[in-house]
């Protein structure tokens, strides 16, 4: 345990996570994606541009090759990858930039790969949330597989409030792939002043840094994640001059060393000068484990003895972090694509490696597109059970059939806990 000053928490806990219903609101529309083409009629890009609350379903499965980054800027949207026929939906060749509020993203894979120019590679994330001209809020990213970024696999940009990032795979961020700063490989960045961020039950595998990294000014709950083969950092922090005080609860994360892991890695790395630069920070640590390293670096930073953040009611993490993450994380846990299956197998065997190029691990295996019209229930936006709409109950059943874990929004035979606002 760190040789740190422990003080009492000074504020009431913040609730972390989002209770949004996305596009599943009365008066919404169902939009069918019918082609893997980058653009045009029936494409995902066209669906993103549609106005008004919407649930996007997929009548096609396979790989969408993006000609450029794809951006969602319309609020109240659900991207329901669980509706796609096997092998599901994978985006490649560009980043997904989410710049809208009240959004749910589920059961897709985003694997951009390197671009041809340093200018593009410098911001080649798999998924970016926020970062536009206005703040965004209330976003759930669940059962999404992110890999092969040149910058961050997941970037939660400035001015983002209430995020649930749950049961995802964040893996194999590329190390020497043309980033203008040189060697990279970054898992997840939580930027300054992001509030109420919950990072729960995810697999971080074979990322050199940022598994995740948390900036001063954020309020974040990072718990019950498995971090496998981190290169030089697992969970760590960085200072941003002038930002508001940091609030962080780092709970029950497990770090498993791999072939690329630095011998001195701790589960949580806190800068030794945190107490001087961010004197009002509230950092709570509990139950974090690192094999074979220590849980936390030794230093003069300040901790608190009560968590400054709590999860939304009803989020019940698995009792065994490793088993739960390997069971539930990723786009289609019961029907994994070749990339996720390989990553999970390597983590189980302790052989996962940080890579420079997707070709080192076989790249994407593509077959012909698959087709199956999504059987959306009639009166999809009419009331269903447990305070949900019919379309929500249907999506929950589709997700759990693919291996999604029960959640406040999708209880398994129980009462919905995230009530409609």
Please provide the spans of the model-predicted regions.
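Gram-negative bacterial Sec-dependent N-terminal signal peptides
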Residues: 1-11
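Extracellular beta-rich repeat passengers
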Residues: 214-375, 379, 396
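Right-handed parallel beta-helix
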Residues: 64-198
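Acidic glycine-/aspartate-rich tracts in secreted/extracellular proteins
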Residues: 37-39, 61-63, 83-86, 258-261, ...
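C-terminal non-catalytic accessory extensions
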Residues: 354-421
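Detector for repetitive beta-architecture
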Residues: 30, 41, 53-55, 61-63, ...
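Acidic Gly/Asp/Thr-rich repetitive segments characteristic of extracellular carbohydrate-active
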Residues: 18-56
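A structural signal for beta-strand register positions
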Residues: 78, 83, 109, 145, ...
């Amino acid at each position: 345990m760190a040789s740190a000053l422990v003080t009492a928490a000074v504020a009431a806990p913040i609730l972390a996570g989002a209770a949004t219903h996305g596009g599943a609101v009365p008066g919404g529309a169902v939009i069918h994606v019918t082609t893997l083409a980058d653009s045009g009629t029936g494409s995902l890009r066209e669906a993103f541009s549609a106005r008004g609350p919407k649930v996007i379903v997929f009548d096609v499965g396979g790989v969408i090759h993006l000609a450029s980054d794809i951006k969602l800027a319309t609020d109240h949207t659900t991207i329901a990858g669980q509706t796609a026929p096997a092998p599901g939906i994978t985006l490649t060749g560009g980043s997904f930039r989410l710049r809208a509020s009240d959004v749910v993203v589920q059961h897709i894979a985003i694997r951009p790969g390197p671009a041809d120019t340093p200018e593009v590679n410098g911001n080649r994330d798999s998924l970016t949330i926020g970062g536009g001209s206005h703040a965004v809020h209330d976003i759930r990213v669940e059962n999404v597989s992110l890999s092969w970024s040149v910058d961050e696999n997941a970037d939660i940009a400035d001015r983002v409030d209430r995020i649930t990032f749950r049961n995802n795979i964040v893996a194999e961020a590329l190390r020497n792939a043309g980033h203008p700063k040189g060697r990279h490989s970054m898992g997840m960045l939580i930027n300054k002043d992001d509030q109420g961020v919950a990072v729960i039950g995810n697999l971080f595998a074979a990322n050199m840094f940022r598994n995740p990294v948390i900036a001063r000014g954020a309020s974040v709950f990072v718990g019950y994640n498995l971090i496998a083969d981190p290169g030089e950092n697992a969970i760590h922090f960085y200072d941003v001059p002038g930002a508001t005080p940091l609030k962080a609860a780092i709970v029950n994360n497990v770090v498993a060393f791999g072939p690329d892991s630095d011998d001195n890695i701790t589960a949580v790395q806190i800068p030794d000068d945190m107490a001087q630069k961010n004197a009002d920070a509230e950092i709570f640590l509990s139950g974090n484990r690192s094999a074979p390293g220590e849980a936390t670096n030794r230093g003069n930073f300040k901790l608190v003895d009560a968590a400054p953040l709590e999860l939304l009611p009803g989020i019940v993490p698995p009792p065994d972090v490793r088993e739960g993450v390997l069971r539930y994380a990723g786009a289609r846990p019961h029907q994994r694509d070749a990339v996720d299956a390989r990553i999970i197998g390597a983590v189980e065997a302790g052989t996962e490696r940080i890579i420079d190029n997707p070709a080192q691990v076989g790249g994407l295996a593509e077959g012909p597109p698959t087709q199956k019209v999504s059987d959306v229930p009639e009166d999809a936006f009419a009331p269903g059970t447990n305070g949900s709409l019919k379309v929500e109950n249907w999506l929950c059943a589709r997700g759990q059939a693919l291996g999604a874990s029960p959640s406040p929004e999708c209880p398994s035979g129980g009462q919905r806990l995230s009530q409609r606002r």
